[in-house]
Amino acid sequence: MYSDMGNIMISYISERGDVSEVFDRYLSFMTESLCGLGLDAVRSGRNDIMVDGRKVSGNALHQLPDRSIVHGTLLYDTDMEALEEAIRPPVEKLARHGVESVRQRVANLSRYSSQNAALKSVDALVEYLLDRFTDGEIVLDSDQIAKIEEMSNDYLIH
């Protein structure tokens, strides 16, 4: 997965489950959400989402003892030159897919901004996904926030 300031990162946390089932649930939701914006979004392989034959999302899964976490990216306004520099697959792999460069295989969702208001900005797309993804807002109290900060500090040290 590639990440920069021009993409949206999503973590989907669920009860631990079969890897294929968790991926299926998450990727089906994301694909349906993008289709709901008028995009021709389809799953590709185990963990990618394509629009018009170009990859717009890559995803990975991590299993904890009691949770499954899918982490994904949505390319929104990614710097394609930087992406191409960072991800240099072997020429043979590109040739197998009939393309000359990484740039030919990926797309930013911002290129479709004229199709739907939810694609006009990162904030609008995030709001659209949050409306579809969540059951509501959870407000954390100061003890919960302190615990999260403690856990993240411990994580960052290791």
Residue ranges and their predicted role:
Residues 6-56, 60, 73:
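A generic, well-ordered mixed alpha/beta core segment in the N-terminal half of proteins
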Residues 4, 17-28, 43-44, 65-68, ...:
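Short, amphipathic alpha-helical segments
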Residues 1:
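Active-site cofactor/substrate anionic-group-binding motifs, chiefly glycine-
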Residues 37-38, 57, 65-158:
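Long, positively charged amphipathic alpha-helical accessory segments at protein N-termini or as interdomain linkers
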Residues 5, 15, 26-32, 79, ...:
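Generic signature of intrinsically disordered, low-complexity segments enriched in small/polar residues
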